[in-house]
Structure formats: C-alpha cells, structure tokens
Amino acid sequence: MSEIIAYKLNGELIDTQSINGREAVAQPVYFDNSPDALHVIRHSCAHLMAQAIKSLYPNAKFFVGPNVEDGFYYDFRVDEAGTKLGESDLEAIEKKMKELAEAKFEITKICSTKAAMSEKFKNDDLKQEVLKRIPEGEVSSYAQGDFEDLCRGPHVPNTKFLRFFKLTRVAGAYLGGDETREMLNRIYGTAYADKASLAEHIRIIEEAKKRDHRKLGVEMKLFGFDEEVGGGLPIWLPNGGRLRSKLEQILYKAHRDRGYEPVRGPELLKADVWKRSGHYANYKENMYFTTIDDAEYGIKPMNCVGHIKVYQTEIRSYRDLPLKFFEYGVVHRHEKSGVLHGLFRVREFAQDDSHIFCMPSQIKQNILEILSFAGKIMQNFGFEYEMEISTKPAKAIGSDEIWDIATNALKEALDENGFKYGIDEGGGAFYGPKIDIKITDALKRKWQCGTIQVDFNLPERFDLGYIDANNERQRPVMLHRALLGSFERFIGILIEHTAGELPFFIAPTQVVIVPISDAHLDYAKEIARELRKFNIDSEVASKNESLNKRIRTAEKQRVPMIIVLGDNEVANRSVALRDRQARTQSDMSLAEFLNLTKEKLSEVHF
C-alpha cells in the first residue's frame, strides 16, 4: 500500500501537518492518482515550482498558486524591471524543481496571526496583496528548505513525493484579475503520482495542440479575428458561414418538429427592463451599456427578456401551454481580455436559445423532452455526456423556498427516469437552478455546453400569467434552455473533437471535384449541379495547379470526399472516389455516388 499524504474529514482535505491526532476518525488519502491525492500533489508542486523560480531568480515575488483542472499555476513577478519569462525558460525551471524534489525537503506548516504574517512579509508587496484578501484570524504559511509562502494547504509531507511533473505553458495574468493592475508572469503545470500517467497527459496535451480549433480554423478557412475589429469578436469566413448555416438549418427543423415557435427579440433594450429582470443588479458587470436620447440602454447578454415580451403580447390560456419559443439569439457579454480564447470565450456569440412557458405540473415532462432532444444531438455528433445540477449561488434573486421548489423539480425529473447526475453547489444562474449538460470529447476532456434552467423568479418579476381551467389567473413557470450553449463554443469543441474531420452532414465543403484537365471540366460542373439539388456543397478544383497539389489542398481543408475525373470517368459517367472519413478509395458510377451522398445525409436524425 502506498504512503498516506493527507486525510479527508467531513469532506475537507487535511494534510498530515494539520491532522493533529484526528487520524482515527479521518479517511486516509494515499499517494496515487485519485482526485483527492492529485489535488494535494499538484498544489504542492506549485510551491515546488515557486521554490525553483526563487532559486533561479532571487528577486522573484509570488502572488497566488492555486490548482486548476488537470494541474496548477503560479502568478509571480520575476523582478522590478518586469522581466517576462517564455517557453524557453521552462526547461531550466523543471531541472531545478527536480533537484529540489530530490533533496527531500520536509514541508512544514507555520500558523500565526494576520498581523504577524504581515510583519514577516512586510517587504513583499505581492504577499501584502494576498493578505488583504484574507479575513482576520489564523493565517498559515508553508516552508520547504529556504522557501516559505502564504498558503492554506493542503500539502504533501515531503518534496520526495513530487517526482512526476511537467510545466506546460507560460502566460500573462493581471494582478488579481484587474486589467488596471500590472501584468504578472503565470506558469501552468501538472503533476501525477506515476510516470505513465504523466506521459499519457503529455500525449494528450500534444494531441490537443494539433487539434487546436484556432489553428484548424485558419487551415480550414472557417473564421478569424482582427485586432482592428476587437478581441473576442469572431469573423466568419464563407466556409465557416456554411458550417454554421447547416447546423442552424438542421436544428431549426428539429425545433419545429418538436413544437417550438421561432421568435426574435431586440438586441438593445432599455436599462429599466434589465433592472426589472434583475440583470442590472446581478449581471451588470458582464453587460455593455449606451445612452440614446438621454435614456440608458443595455445590449442583451441573454435572450430571456425578449421572449418574456413575446409572451406578454397576448392573454394566455392553460390550453396554450406549454408555449415554446426559440431563437438563434446574438448576445454580448463583457469578458476580460485575458480570458478570451478562440471560439471558446468570446464577447459576441449566438445561442440556440429557447424559453418554455408552462404550468408547474408540466415541468418534469418538458425537462425530459429537452433531455431527449439533447441526447439526440450529442449522439449524432459522437459525444458522450453527463449531467450536473447547479444550485443557488451567493448572488441570487428569489426566496429560498422558490429555489428549493425549482431545484427539487430538476432532481425529481432526473431521479424518476434513472439519470445519474452530480451537484455543483452554488453554480446556478442568479435567477434559478439549472442542469448543465457536460460533454466528453475524443481526448476525454469535459466541456459544459447545454443548460436547462427552472425559473420561478422572472415570471414573478414580470407578472406573467395564464388563465386556468377555472378561469382564474395563475403564474407560469419559465424554463430556459440552450442545447449547444452557443454556436461558437460548440463549433470550437466539435473541431477539436473531430480534429477538423467534421461530419459529412455539416462539412462546409462536402465534396471536392478534381478534373484532371480542362477536357473533364464540363463533367465536373455537371456533377456539382447534381449535388446542389441535394443541398450538398461541392467545389470544382480547376485552378491551374498540378493534380497532386489540388488534391493536397482539399485534404488540408479536410473535405470528406474527393472525386477525381479523367478520360475513363467521363466516358463511363463514373467517379474515382477518395472517401477521407471511411479511408477508402473506389470507383463507382455517378448514380451510385449520388446515392451514397444522399444516404450520408439521411443517416442524421435530430
């Protein structure tokens, strides 16, 4: 059995330095790759990295070094001159980390008062910044060798446990996330309990670099960004426009088949309506505002208010419910420049957004219908998925009673139908609890995409009503629902999941037709016209380039099918097909090829 590196007591991780005789009533955490063990190992490795940096750069000062998903980071200043480290510096830091780990330093915990710690670190302005954020009371630091840093822990007992680690990337980070403050160095890393697990993680990192949607998006001519336009504002190129349009069209039909009505709300609404909805008080920092004719307006960060206004255009009866509205709504949210990341984190995006107005007795059935719809989508794109219920956050509107009713409605819908789910305490939207649909991609990474939210609050705030069977006015429940989350984010995830090998039914260009010479061009154009009849996008590669170069260009853009036409194909009305996704080459008649493409489209059922 491996050594104990920490304990868990009442759900809290406690290191061996802090257990203080409570071992008998605590659950041991062994040195392995369990989530609890990795949390302790990685947090300790962040301190080991800081110790190495301090050894190499004696004037370095450190801010914070928390765990993040799959690893850790540390924010620090190299020196007063503002020196920035790069990827080339990581090797030397790793080498020093290994030396320090092999020294087998005991890691000790030091407890004191906030005032005493402030005095100890009086010449360290970044430590003073950390102390400002710590409430009064006992404050702890951890020491190993000649290095000491403020920290709550938990840590491994000795640096000997820190053998299998990798520093993965360098970034910049504003002090405390405040864009008006200085930019610090940030180094990310990860650690494991054994060599094989670390090697597998590194393999996944390298594979993720190859699949990076920002890189593939350029290669496939899907989208781009322009600093003159602004950060976080993607520009969709023709290939990307076709991809989005196909996705939108498929989902449009799927929504209509399920009884959803298309609507559209304005993108700019008076601030008064955002005050009424609660967004002004609870979400203002994420919104953009402007003044028109002395009145304040807010650009919508969500589509819910617009759909409420659609609901209010008529008196509604219980016979009308559930009433399902949907919109590909363009929304804008303020994101700090440091967190913008390709299509994953943008300032403008479109949601596949829907709001369902229903009676309380209809909640469960509608949630189950939504989950079935979501399952169909994930199945067609080859994603595994799981669900998580997010509960009331610290900043929220509505009473605890209403929140409990809404949260229980979500749990009951999942429980009664055997769905497994996790709980994210405090992770709900400010107006209601939600089910998050988290998908797993080909690299086993988890992404939060779709969401289902139960909302009793906004119907109350906007005094929504319907007339029941007894001719009395009742309050409807509002279900917020987005299945992809946003088109931008979902497309980015899909590109990385498939390594750019997009499914045939949404590929921007589905077929490239390569005539060997001009003598075969008319036949190529005829095939392109036939494909358009089935809504299949094709391109005739007739540039004055070599045959091999035209084929390589199509392959680089990951076009699913390439057909080559020469004298034999023209004479026999056939095609020489290279099916990229099936990894086959074959000859077939034109009729057979057209049937094959139609079959590929018909395989998709949303």
UniProtKB/Swiss-Prot annotation:
Q: Which family does it belong to?
A: Belongs to the class-II aminoacyl-tRNA synthetase family.
Q: Which cofactor does it need?
A: Zn(2+)
Provide the assembly information. Homodimer.
Question: Its GO CC terms?
Answer: cytosol
Q: What is the lineage of its organism?
A: Bacteria, Pseudomonadati, Campylobacterota, Epsilonproteobacteria, Campylobacterales
List the GO molecular function terms.
Answer: ATP binding; metal ion binding; threonine-tRNA ligase activity; tRNA binding
The main location class comes to cytoplasm
Protein name, please? Answer: Threonine--tRNA ligase
For this chain's record, the cofactor binding note is: Binds 1 zinc ion per subunit.
* Gene that this polypeptide is encoded by: thrS
